[in-house]
Amino acid sequence: MADLVIRGGTIVDGTGAPRRRADVAVDGGRIVAIGDALDGDRELDASGHVVAPGFIDIHTHYDAQVFWDPDLTPSSFHGVTTVVAGNCGFSIAPIRPEGVGILARTLQHVEDMSFDTLSVGVPWDEFETFPQYLEAVARRGTALNYGCYVGHTATRLYVMGEEAYERAATPDELDRMRAVVADAMAGGAIGFASSASPTHNGDQGRPVPSRVATWTSSAI
């Protein structure tokens, strides 16, 4: 007998198959059967409701919000069960303590996030590297599956400081960026994200650091 049966819902399974009425049996946190008259220790009446796989939102900017809204309510309230953050190169790690201000101002300009909220809502003193950021997120937990890219803009600011807004990286700086990204990937980043969009302007209205990079350095 399963732990839970979701009873009588309309199944939309995402395969393109016609919707149908059925029960869903869940055991040990996994779906083990879909059919009729299934038995379970507990039942959830889904009559009149759709039962479907959780949606995956591949483009979010929850990098900071995850700390003050671990339920990620704009997504979880709409059937999303997996989110991807760090898009467009705007992760909030890696980050040096002295770089918090410029990174927060960058996000304020490009993503319309409140500087004050970013300043007090993120535990900046708990992380510097990208793996440390993921550990800080994990300590608090999230309601959804949470994956995050390591960002190009964040990486350039981490290695180059303010000059990331002004020029391309030197060969030595590129080597340091490669090491930072490799560390992030080994520590749980799901990939590397960048942006060359002309709409992405950051601190003081300047093009974000990833736009200043050459295409060669974008493939670090």
Enumerate the predicted regions with their spans.
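Short, small-residue-rich loop/turn micro-motifs
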Residues: 48-50, 150, 196-198
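Flexible loop/turn segments at secondary-structure boundaries
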Residues: 13, 63, 90-94, 154-157, ...
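A generic secondary-structure micro-motif detector
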Residues: 60-62, 123, 170, 211
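Histidine-rich, glycine-flanked metal-binding segment
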Residues: 1-5, 11-54
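Divalent metal-coordination and catalytic microenvironments
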Residues: 9, 24, 29, 48, ...
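Divalent-metal coordination cores built from histidine and acidic residues
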Residues: 68-191
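Functional cores that coordinate and move charged inorganic groups
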Residues: 166-171, 178-185, 189-220
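Di-metal (Zn2+ and/or Mg2+/Mn2+) metal-binding site signature of metallo-dependent hydrolases
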Residues: 51-74
